[in-house]
């Protein structure tokens, strides 16, 4: 899909970046959920969905603990899956905790203990109607190194859920699933997952697909060669019936891949962002065809950044600084949606003081206001 623009924003952004840092002039930062002593995190793992001005986001709610490294969550205390919903385009939010979405009992999710009361894992028969606009799925993992993984599904915009359903390993040493999928048709879905490498460690991106409404899920392809380090946490956009662009988290940068045969094979386009401290991307397509990527910036000054591509991911702008007031590197995992009015809602976990709780925040902003 090609779009002719009279004055490409990308060119303007590059020229502007030579003179000053890029920021949206109208960005509004909001607290979505914050509670003293708690760790709220990782929207990128759980997913975001929208229906007009109705937006639904998932996240993990555990307990804060000031660890020596990594995430500041107490791995010895149970965590739970939580949703937050906005009916006004991200201005206000309410917390939801459907019973069917809770993690399986007495195990781990993303290495964090689960409680005793969640529904047990089971094999699910499939038969899902992907053409239902209210149908959504979320994918979760036990260990970030080697899985295993499961999924939940909802047919009513996340008000009620069924699961957890065993996902399988697709012949891989392990599957560490987060939520990234594309609906291709009423019974056809492509899912982008992280698999363990041959040494049993994270990870590399694989593509799986169902053509029979989830009754069977089949391995389709690897996205790139097995890395020496890791290549994980994809975020995908369909450009056409055959073309898909996917952004992938690397150790300290973001890779962008493209497939022109609907996911059968992939080519590396570029590194969209470098030296960011390690954080997953969230990529969406604007109404005019531009690609917009957001991610957490885990170096000083800590914050949330964005970049834009005018040419389907071939090149990217300089960083757009959504905020720079982070208290430490334990932040990010963004997910972004485009509202009907064209404004963007970027949701992420955040901190303004590294020694205090992690909270869920949102930035509402307009790409057209970037200067």
Over which residues does each language-model region extend?
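Bacterial N-terminal signal peptides
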Residues: 6-15
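Positively charged n-region of N-terminal signal peptides that target proteins for export
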Residues: 1-4
